[in-house]
């Protein structure tokens, strides 16, 4: 992809890199690479460089981080902590537009407190992937006036932190 001399700004994506178990009428995937920050960065990389800030557990397969790196995603700010990786389990019916959450296990994600490194604080585009809305707000306070920020959430946070979501 040519950029015709246009300087591309790095996108900062902060949030979930996970292991997902997904069941559809067409099959099931167990502990597949998942998470909002993962899916966002895999897509956004076609348009601009992406740096991911996330936490995974010591059980997170190294092949998943290797895949993200091969896609050109900066994973230098993905920390590996003692404990289990965030897991989500869901089910889709024939209408693949909506999922039913079967289980959410926060694990190391429950204590995730992202610190944005100086080289990422000037990011003009910030994607707040599926994380606690209070943490999303703390990330916004660490970056210097992004031109655009977007917030992803899910039923887990909508049910437990609705008031915090309104402040994002």
Could you tell me what each predicted segment is?
Residues 38-45:
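Proline/glycine-anchored alpha-helix kink/cap motifs
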Residues 1-5:
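Short, basic, low-complexity termini and linkers enriched in Ser/Thr/Gly/Pro
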Residues 36-38, 80-82, 153-157:
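Short, acidic/turn-prone active-site loops that include or flank metal/cofactor-
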Residues 124-168:
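Conserved beta-alpha-beta core of the PfkB/ribokinase-like small-molecule kinase fold
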Residues 8-9, 19-31, 46-127, 140-145:
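Conserved N-terminal subdomain of the carbohydrate kinase-like
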Residues 15-17:
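Active-site metal-binding loops of divalent metal-dependent hydrolases
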């Amino acid at each position: 992809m040519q950029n015709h001399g246009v300087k591309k700004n790095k996108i900062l994506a902060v949030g979930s890199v996970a292991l997902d178990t997904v069941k559809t009428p067409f099959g099931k995937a167990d502990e597949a690479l998942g998470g909002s920050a993962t899916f966002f960065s895999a897509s956004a990389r076609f348009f601009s460089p992406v740096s991911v800030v996330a936490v995974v557990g010591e059980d997170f397969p190294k092949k998943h981080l290797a895949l993200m790196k091969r896609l050109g995603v900066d994973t230098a700010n993905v920390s590996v902590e003692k404990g289990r990786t965030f897991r989500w389990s869901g089910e889709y019916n024939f209408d693949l537009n909506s999922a039913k959450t079967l289980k959410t296990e926060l694990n190391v994600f429950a204590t995730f407190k992202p610190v944005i490194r100086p080289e990422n604080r000037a990011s003009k585009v910030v994607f707040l992937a599926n994380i606690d809305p209070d943490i999303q707000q703390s990330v916004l306070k660490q970056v210097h006036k992004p031109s655009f920020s977007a917030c992803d959430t899910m039923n887990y946070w909508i049910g437990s932190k609705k008031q915090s979501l309104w402040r994002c």
